[in-house]
Structures are given as structure tokens and as C-alpha cells.
Amino acid sequence: MQKGPLSLATVSHTETFWRKVGPKRDGLGTGDGLHSWVLQEPVSTGDNPRECDSQGTSKDTLVREGKTYKCKECGKDLFNKNSLLVRHHQIHAGVKTYECQECGKAFHEKVDFVPHMRIHTGEKPCKCVECGKVFNRRSHLLCHHRIHTGEKPYECSECGKTFSYHSVFIQHRMTHTGEKLFGSKERGKTFYCNSSLTRHTKIHTGEKPCKVQ
């Protein structure tokens, strides 16, 4: 895929595009040395148009209850605006509004799309005040901070062992259930975690990354 500025495209009946502009360029910059993301006008894809108030969602799925709107698919009723419920219903419909033009990965929400873009740009705005380590997501920073606080919120109900990270906790749970998600193509052997599979694969490839001097 050709490298270029990251952009956003809507995967639906109309396409919306974002373009990246530098500071003080085209009169759209903020002057703070940062790039901006500018929303372009919607472009019709030629598909059948829908009413703006429905946004592609059947009104039968929207139920007004008091001051909130309830989703008939999953029962959530935490939406105080019809537009928020419509956006939520796209999850059930499989619609992913935000697509990365760099790698093609798509997301339901902008809040997930923006941190993903930082993988390509290398931006890591979330910094740990304890050790200075930086992250591209605030959630990653919060998980990292447990190293300093000693917090281990995930406890195994089988053996009582506690963990700071959910991913490590899930891998530990597999030792009790016997579930193994990662398999070797060469021998058909399976492993609890991807790192174990990687080490095993090096046996077949002959790779020896750690050389003794």
C-alpha cells in the first residue's frame, strides 16, 4: 500500500474524508506546531440515499424510554441522544465508520481510530510521571502505572493468583482450562501465549537471536 498522509473514510452510503494539514497552512493551522485533521464535505457513493434522521438504521430498533434511548439489540439505554444510539447500533450492523488509509483497519468510533493513527505517526502523548515512559493510548498508560502502584485487579478464581494486566490474566486462566490458542504449523503443537509460539518457531527456523560473546 502506498505510503502517504493518514486519512479517514466512512464505510457506508456516503463517504467522509479527513485530510491532514500542517500549522498555518491553507489558513487552517493552529500555529502550535501540530498537525490538524480537517473534515471534508460528504461525497455520495451513488448508493440509495437514506433520510438524515435515520442514518441507515431502522426506526424499529430505536425505542424512546423517558430521557434516554434504548437499543433493542442489546438492551443498553445509556444514550441521551438519538444520534448516539444510531452510532451504537452500527456496532450491531457491522458498520465501521473510520477506516485507516495506511493499513485498511476500520473502527466503529473515532475514539479508537485516533489512537490507532498514532501507531503510524509514532506519536505517544501519554507520559508516565513516575518513569517517563510514553504511550499512544491513555488506557495503556493506566495499565503501565500499576507497575508503580502494585495494583493487581485481576484475580484467578481457581488459584487466587493476581495480575496487573488483563492479557496476562487471560493467558494464566488457560493453564486451568487447557485452552491453547496459538498453534505451530510445522508440528501442530499448541501454546498458551504467542510469545511461547514465537520461541518454539525459532527451533524450526534455526534463528538464534541471543548470541553469546
UniProtKB/Swiss-Prot annotation:
Keywords assigned: DNA-binding, Metal-binding, Nucleus, Repeat, Transcription, Transcription regulation, Zinc, Zinc-finger
InterPro entries, A to Z: Znf_C2H2_sf, Znf_C2H2_type
Zinc fingers (C2H2-type) by residue: 69-92, 98-120, 126-148, 154-176, 182-204
Listed GO MF terms: DNA-binding transcription factor activity, RNA polymerase II-specific; RNA polymerase II cis-regulatory region sequence-specific DNA binding; zinc ion binding
Compartments where located: Nucleus
GO cellular component: nucleus
UniProt keyword Transport, yes or no: no
Superkingdom field: Eukaryota
First-listed, main subcellular location of the protein, grouped into a coarse class: nucleus
Pfam families, A to Z: zf-C2H2 (PF00096)
Record keyword Lyase present: no
Record-linked SUPFAM superfamilies: beta-beta-alpha zinc fingers
Gene3D superfamilies found in the cross-reference section: Classic Zinc Finger
Function: May be involved in transcriptional regulation.
PANTHER family referenced in this protein's UniProt entry, alphabetically: ZINC FINGER AND SCAN DOMAIN-CONTAINING (PTHR23226), ZINC FINGER PROTEIN 80 (PTHR23226:SF203)
Family that this chain belongs to: Belongs to the krueppel C2H2-type zinc-finger protein family.
UniProt name for this protein: Zinc finger protein 80
Native organism: Chlorocebus aethiops
Top-level taxonomy: Eukaryota, Metazoa, Chordata, Craniata, Vertebrata
Gene: ZNF80
